[in-house]
Amino acid sequence: MAEEVKWTDEQKQAIYEKDSNILVAAAAGSGKTAVLVERIINKIINEKTDIDRLLVVTFTNAAASEMRERVLKAIYKKIDENPEDERLQRQVTLLNKASICTIDSFCLDVVRNNFFEIDISQNFRIADTTEIEILQQDVLEELFEEKYESKDENFAKLINTYTGYRDDTPLKELILTIYKYIQSNPYPEKWLDEKIEMFNFNLEECKDFSQTSWGKILLKQIKEVVDDGIIQLKPEVQKLSECDDLKKSYEFLRGNLNQLELLQANLDTWDKAYTIYATMDFGKWTMDRNVKLDEKVNAQKVREKVLSTLKSSAEKVLIMDSNEAYQDIINMYDILKKLEGLILDFSQIFAKRKKEKNMVDFSDVEHFALKILLDENGNPTEIAKKYQSKFDEIAIDEYQDSNLVQEYILTSISKGNNIFMVGDVKQSIYKFRQARPDLFLSKYKTYKLKQDKTENDDLKIQLFKNFRSRKEVLDFSNLIFSKIMTEELGELNYTEEEYLNLGADYKDTGEDLKTEIDIITIDNKEDEEEPEELEVEVDENEDTQDEEFKTEVERKEDIEVEAMFVANKIKQLIDNKFQVYDAKAKEKRDIKYKDIVVLLRSTKISAPIFEKEIIKLGIPVFSDSSSEYLESLEIQTIMNLLKIIDNPLQEIPLVATMRSTIGGFTDNELVEIRLSDKYDNFYNTLLKSKKDVSEQLRNKINKFLEQIEMWRKEQEYLSLDELIWKIYNDTGYFNYVGLMRNGELRQANLKMLFERAKQCESISFKGLYNFINYIEKIKTSSKDMDSAKIIGENDDVVRIMSIHKSKGLEFPVVILANSGKQFNLQDLNSKILLHPELGIGVKYIDYDMQITYDTLSKRAIKNKMKIETLSEEMRVLYVALTRAKEKIIITGLAKKEKQDKMLENVEKYDELNIMLLSKAKSYLDWITLVHLYYERTMESLATWNVLQKEDIIKMCATQEPEKEENKNMAQKNLLLLKHKKADRIFNDQLFTV
């Protein structure tokens, strides 16, 4: 019999409290899902609430399914205890139609049930993401062609401003970027118009630029630099004052300090600060004769650094007075209004085309639902009031990842005091999906704890006990984040109130469970022979060319060394039978492969390298990175065949098919065919060559052409998916690829192609020609499709995955690898920056004068977005460290020069501050800063190892040489695991033709 759960006092509050809006701040591993399920059960059992009177909104479909299963299991348990309770039995039936779903599913339900309230067909369908992207490109082409033909003057000016007539792609990308961004706002067109109107100043009425939100941010930035400079100079001035021989140097440096203090005192007003900075003259430091130089030389170094930092910041900000700043912004108003018009034109045509195809995307569904639930004045409609009556409570899981549209929708159907929100703002890591952690934070600051709550207050509950991890994991995580996460950088003060507190009951396994940090130092000097370089991966939320933020090109050679080290670390854990605690068996056991995860910030570049090195040691591993599905051999082979079935005159696909396993022609045979007629199309040559080639080749050609002709006839009456599956059977190609290396994966990829074809038959890409065109457009849009996944969660393999994909998971041993990878801040250099409050940041562009530079509004937004991006990176690091149950291992590459520079910076400051933290370029930088400032505490919680790249290479070279059987062993292990699992993903009945 299972033990009864012992809920903490805080968990009990989250389960039983009611009659107000409730925000549950649930730290990592605090059992929030279990609490939410128990709250639902309590509503059903004790409060006699039927399950269909609850709306439970989850972040993913998988989470919704898990929630349903847990609730059903709990209901059955209660039925076992009370078999005569008919009401409980009825809940099982009601659960089938209960609203436990994602926000997308709920909105879809609202729209389908109320389609008559808006201008939409009852039979609309949800479009495939790729289909939407292709349609967007088609609409842009149509729109631009129309504008070119009509010689639209506004359009011509936009082309001049953003493309210079060389290529209109940048303008198209700009339109799509802004269009997609504004869809996360409840009223997209209104938001865009309001933010553009922020540029519509009356110059005569303008106040000091410091009165704008942009000016406040920029002056705050300068103040931080000036404050920091004063902190650094004061000790140097004091040292010089104590040395009689350095009187002249003292007076000179004192004068510099006075100027900084004067600027500091006037940073509340833009024009004062601008005027003072413009007249500042720090002079040239002359040498004192016959004096000791140590104090002066050090003071000179500090001064140069301070003035250099001030110059690099102020020269980008205090470059114009208020009038000039406003004038720059006003000058961009006209072009932005023209851009707005083009975006609205695109939006209207795009909406029209979707309507013609009777399709919508999920963004449409949300906005349709909003239109149904809120009237023009933002008040709940009669339909919304019906939903208010329908639901006794609205529970929102992962609330930190909500956006503003979802907030409006769920608030509109609430009674005003019946929303239960659970989440952890420290795990808000979906900024690129327009998640708004500020929604959580605003409630976190205003809702009251129970002891402080009055009748009209909303309630805040904190779940701070962690039931996932050992004390060693929690203590290390708490140390790191208590030193780096603040409201200024991190958007939350990580005080003791936020600490992860031990809740798990682990037994001693006799292992050293201190966090292990392994830094691999790499030489700064370039090798005589240039190593192979890898382009830096650009995620959808990344972009920067500014020297201050430039991401270094990652070198494949260096990543390989770190991957070697990680592979050996995993082998040591397995070979040494590292002990982990089995909570179910309540005893320790040997570690398994599946107990280990390698987490990477991004997987596209690094994951294949780590996978390769781990496989070399005979370790079964599964990498969850996106591979190039459309470039895989099996997909290219079938796509080439489909192309010639559609049109055999296409030479490249024809020759490729003939050379493939399906065609079976040798290179010599193809040359023989070509030589029979060098000038005609290859297909025509093939038809004519039958009389000019050997009998054996003639028979081969006849058989090939007959097969192609048969498929061409069959395509006229078979559906596309039926044709593809028939090709698999006719050629035996499906079975053939199953015998190749990674055969199960290749077969699963072919099944995915079949499924994709089946989907296209039901949408606007029906038929062979349209399907080929659909796939080609995916390629030209630089998109791809993920390869099939055929490894289950219980398979005994080491996993490599991104930190984002690990969210919600847990592993006994977490290896956070590539922690020295620099943050990608490239979005900060886009031509236009978009911010929910600060609006639009643009470059000042004068096409006629060939002048372009960032407006101050853009600089302010860039500054704000950098802080927000670093804050999100901090939260991503929090997610990574809190996946570990028993041990954390952190590895990363670092240049020795950079480590020395960090040590120099640390010596300048008495404590770790935001200036140092905001200059960090990687997770390893933050961890290193904590180590340097809190070395004694860190040493009690972590082992700090500095390794040389060359030593690791030697270590790996002196171990047992790589053997082919090691590779084969890893592959064999994977094949055994994968056996028959492709069929688990796809129902075989689907493929019966």
Describe each PLM feature range.
Residues M1-S30, A34-R39, L260-P380, N417, ...:
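N-terminal accessory segments
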Residues Q826-I867:
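Conserved catalytic motifs of ABC-family nucleotide-binding domains
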Residues I118, G820-S830:
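Cytochrome P450 core scaffold surrounding the K-helix E-X-X-R motif
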Residues C101-C107, L339-D392, V405-Q406, A563-K586:
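Conserved helicase/translocase P-loop NTPase motor core
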Residues K6, D19-N21, T58-A62, L72-T269, ...:
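Conserved ATP-dependent motor core of P-loop NTPases, especially the RecA-like helicase ATPase domain
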Residues R53, K172-V360, D457-D458, M564-F565, ...:
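Conserved ATP-driven helicase/translocase motor core recognized via long
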Residues L95-L108, N160-S184, L339-D345, V360-L373, ...:
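Core structural elements
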Residues M1-E69, Q122, D128-T130, D138, ...:
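Conserved motor-region signature of P-loop NTPase helicases/translocases
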